[in-house]
């Protein structure tokens, strides 16, 4: 195809149509969104659920969302900043924390829907690929589709750790093991032991041991928060094992309690009641009459 220079004349600007705002901002892939949102026409009012996973510098966000005409609705959500409740106080954005957040989302959702006992998921974490199967007589498993947004879906990405946690928690997510840590492209096989190692933070503990031997100063600086919390390379796996058990025992969301003695500052005048307004009018009248005397 020959190169054609775009001539930006009057006709060009008259016919120009701007792209959607979120496309202009580089936030939404509308080609992917269309396929994740549009439901089969023979399913009528059945929502199409998707598991949305996003990463920030300090947090992991996992949500179950479905689309409506007026906008997307969030069914349930889980965040990595909730993990200190379950004993994971550091490393809230690593591979193991992503797995914990996905597991928390799944158990919270199924508890809210009354399916927690029927679909327990994978209780023995061995790193093998797992798929939720229909139990037969009872209700079908909750199905959601993975929404990674604009994340680059490379093998070993943390997005798939959160998805693995949600699947092991009991949510039916259509997937392939080809993007998990430990998958070998040449043999097309998943190395389950390596995936299990990452789920329990083994890669972090290996690096801790390496730094302790090679550079003590860098170890103290790099893992200062781990040292402060008393977490060692040997206690890492048990910390995540206990966290998984606590998440399964109580996945419910806890409201943040207000701090004692906290006084909120007002930057505007408080709204007066009717009684106060009438009293203010009386005072103004009295002050005006006093000036006339």
Curated annotation (Swiss-Prot):
InterPro entries: Rbsml_uL18_euk, Ribosomal_uL18_C_euk
CC terms in the record's Gene Ontology section: cytosolic large ribosomal subunit; nucleus
UniProt biased composition (Basic and acidic residues): 247-263
Keyword RNA-binding: yes
Region spans: Disordered: 247-283
Recorded GO MF terms: 5S rRNA binding; structural constituent of ribosome
Annotated Pfam families: Ribosomal_L18_c, Ribosomal_L5e
Compartments reported by the entry: Cytoplasm; Nucleus
Keyword Ribonucleoprotein: yes
GO biological process: ribosomal large subunit assembly; translation
Keywords: Cytoplasm, Nucleus, Ribonucleoprotein, Ribosomal protein, RNA-binding, rRNA-binding
CDD domains in the cross-refs: Ribosomal_L18_L5e (cd00432)
Record's compositionally biased regions (Basic residues): 264-283
Similarity comment: Belongs to the universal ribosomal protein uL18 family.
Complex formation: Component of the large ribosomal subunit (LSU).
HAMAP family named in the record: Ribosomal_uL18_A
Protein name: Large ribosomal subunit protein uL18
């Amino acid at each position: 195809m020959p190169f054609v220079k775009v001539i930006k004349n009057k006709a060009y600007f008259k016919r120009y149509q701007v792209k959607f705002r979120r496309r202009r901002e580089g936030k939404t892939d509308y080609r992917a969104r269309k396929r994740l949102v549009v439901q089969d026409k023979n399913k009528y009012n059945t929502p199409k659920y998707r598991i949305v996973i996003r990463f920030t510098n300090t947090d992991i966000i996992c949500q179950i969302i479905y689309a409506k005409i007026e906008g997307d609705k969030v069914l349930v959500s889980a965040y990595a900043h909730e993990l200190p409740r379950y004993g994971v106080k550091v490393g809230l954005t690593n591979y193991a924390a992503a797995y914990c957040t996905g597991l928390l989302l799944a158990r919270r959702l199924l508890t809210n829907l009354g399916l927690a006992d029927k679909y327990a998921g994978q209780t023995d974490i061995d790193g093998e690929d797992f798929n939720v199967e229909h139990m037969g007589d009872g209700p079908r498993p909750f199905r959601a589709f993975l929404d990674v947004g604009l994340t680059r879906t490379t093998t070993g990405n943390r997005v798939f750790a959160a998805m693995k946690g949600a699947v092991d928690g009991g949510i039916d997510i259509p997937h392939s093991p080809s993007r998990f840590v430990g998958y070998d492209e040449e043999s097309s096989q998943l190395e389950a032991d390596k995936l299990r190692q990452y789920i329990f933070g083994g890669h972090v503990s290996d690096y801790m041991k390496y730094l302790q031997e090679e550079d003590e100063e860098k170890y103290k600086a790099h893992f200062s928060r781990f040292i402060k919390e008393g977490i060692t390379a040997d206690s890492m796996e048990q910390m995540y094992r206990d966290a998984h058990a606590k998440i399964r025992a109580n996945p419910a969301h806890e409201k943040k309690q207000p701090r004692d003695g906290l006084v909120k500052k007002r930057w505007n005048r408080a709204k007066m009641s009717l009684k106060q307004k009438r009293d203010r009018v009386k005072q103004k009248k009295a002050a005006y009459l006093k000036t006339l005397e």
